Amino acid sequence: MDPEKDRFPRAIVWTPIPVLTWLIPCIGHMGICDSTGRSHDFVGRGVINIDRLAFGRPLLYAPVDSSILFECYDLKYDEEIHAADNHFKSQMHNLLTNNCHHHVAMCLHEPNAFAVWIMFWRNARLAPNRVR
């Protein structure tokens, strides 16, 4: 983990969305980090950010539960993220049914994006680079 460079290997990261998060604090933008800590997030049709979240630096992160990781660990984990990236590059973004949370859920083979959201909030920690 390298908080200064926003690197959180095998973790889900979250950042607030200006105005929206101020009104509803549990709503924000989510991404997933590969085995090297680079973040991947779905922003819209044809747009997958790598190593940069759409709304700024991660405020919270949650390590991915090792019980849901794959046997081949890093290689398979990274392949699943890239597969989800390729799938979502052709998808339209929809605030309720096809968004950054669904991208993370697909990376983890979790059919229910809400389950990923719950897992994140149960395990979220303040990113060390934000504690000052």
Please provide the spans of the model-predicted regions.
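Juxtamembrane amphipathic/hinge helix adjacent to a transmembrane helix
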Residues: 100-132
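Non-catalytic ligand/cofactor/substrate-binding and regulatory segments of enzyme domains
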Residues: 1-14, 18, 24-27, 32-98, ...
